[in-house]
UniProtKB/Swiss-Prot annotation:
Organism classification: Eukaryota, Fungi, Dikarya, Ascomycota, Saccharomycotina
Region called Substrate binding domain (SBD), residue ranges: 403-613
Family label: Belongs to the heat shock protein 70 family. Ssb-type Hsp70 subfamily.
The encoding gene: SSB1
Short sequence motif Nuclear export signal: positions: 574-582
Localization (cell): Cytoplasm
Protein name: Ribosome-associated molecular chaperone SSB1
UniProt region (Lid domain (SBDalpha)), positions on chain: 516-612
A GO molecular-function descriptor: ATP-dependent protein folding chaperone
Amino acid sequence: MADGVFQGAIGIDLGTTYSCVATYDSAVEIIANEQGNRVTPSFVAFTSEERLIGDAAKNQAALNPKNTVFDAKRLIGRAFDDESVQKDIKSWPFKVVESNGQPLIEVEYLDETKTFSPQEISSMVLTKMKEIAEAKIGKKVEKAVVTVPAYFNDAQRQATKDAGAIAGLNVLRIINEPTAAAIAYGLGAGKSEKERHVLIFDLGGGTFDVSLLNITGGVFTVKATAGDTHLGGQDFDTNLLEHFKKEFQKKTGNDISSDARALRRLRTACERAKRSLSSGTQTTVEIDSLFDGEDFSANITRARFEDINSALFKSTLEPVEQVLKDAKISKSQVDEVVLVGGSTRIPKVQKLLSDFFDGKQLEKSINPDEAVAYGAAVQGAILTGQSTNDDTKDLLLLDVIPLSLGVAMQGNVFAPVVPRNTTVPTIKRRTFTTVADHQTTVQFPVYQGERVNCTENTLLGEFDLKNIPPMQAGEPVLEAIFEVDANGILKVTAVEKSTGRSANITISNSIGRLSTEEIEKMISDAEKFKSSDDAFAKRHEQKQKLEAYVASVESTVTDPVLSAKLKKSAKDKIEAALSDALQTLEIEESSADDYRKAELALKRAVTKGMATR
């Protein structure tokens, strides 16, 4: 490699199954690896002698299944007990162990047992992509723009940034995959000043995003985004693998579930069959000596493949409906529907999408495997001042956060500070106060999600604001300041206004227990469960009203001047009603109606008592 440092920043699409790298030098170039392939498998293999990354790792996977690691993107930024992690562990041939609540990958390397974090495995893939670029450019690469699914949460974004740092890269920006693809499409389509609504449908190997953008000239504004960080080509392969596994068992009586090598060979054949069925209507899967000397041969038609995956294919339309709803536009107002990600080559996926948009012609003008890296390279050139042509010089990218951010208030009620689909970077403020007299510490638990009840959302982290001057409840003014940077990474600061005391947290190591089901359904659940959310909010509101009224009655009854004016019988009745109200407050199961009735009964007793003075 020649001396010197590359002044620009490369663009890396770090994919679940394949990765791609691009550079910008007056125009974007997708860089092929040493095998001449423009995409590189996101695989890392460990042997007694060496470590292999990319094609070399994937090619030996069947011979060394337990030490060949893939799908690191499905682990990154997730907790070990995440539902999707637990489900994936069952199908992976490599071992995943738990350490401090985080998943680690255990392999045999250089004849020793070693463990690696998902960030480390991802950093190895990033290093490979960096080396591919350096071989082409002839200079050392230090800066990169790395892409993530739009629906990645705070923990997953931060972990990806960390992987870049481990790979020796200064990650200038984390950008969303569909937004990067939109840049590739928007520039390729020729810059038009006419306003266009463009829907990016990005179905890759392991993740799925839908983003709706408004493109006007060089300004790309994301209006809404939705998706599933655990849906892609891998899942279609898995369903096909299950189908053939049963077929093999029916034919031979052999169950290959516990044979990692047989499973890897069958998965590779399934991936090949899936690709064949995108162009042909049927294909044959043939594997010599799959298990116990038994050969396996089976035919599969496109129709059968579509049937096996019909539920997953149909589920891709839910985020499409969601973004249209969030962006408040009808499907007829969408000017272009752009396909991104290798899995959009599947004819059935295309047909469902086209039918949804009333037979609309889908945009296939950009390469679905390369568009994301292309857009990342353009962004890299802009951030390093290397963009030379007019198209890219004036380009402005306005992205959004995928899920609301906020804090838990008394009663575990979620108080959103930054609503979902807010353009980033952003700073939002919200004022809070104390709930008890002379309270000197307030805890700020920070959540991400769409539900009223915080337990239904993801806890990202928590911090305390201490040394608040002791005052009556409700008097201190505490301001929570949420700053989301252009990477979508959050910093929260709380300030007590009278003293200027502050505490803050950068949510860099989020607790990250967002299960796939929660991510997938968070927004649709918020609608489906709106009634229970409303009931939760109403109950909390009534409880607060009762608590406030009880406190005022207690102060009246205990005030020597006021209580002396009450007849004993009236005072007894008020105290009895007060006791009932306190009991209602103590019962966990009390409903909003129970609190309302208790408040009414207490009000009656007080009104009567005061009238008989």
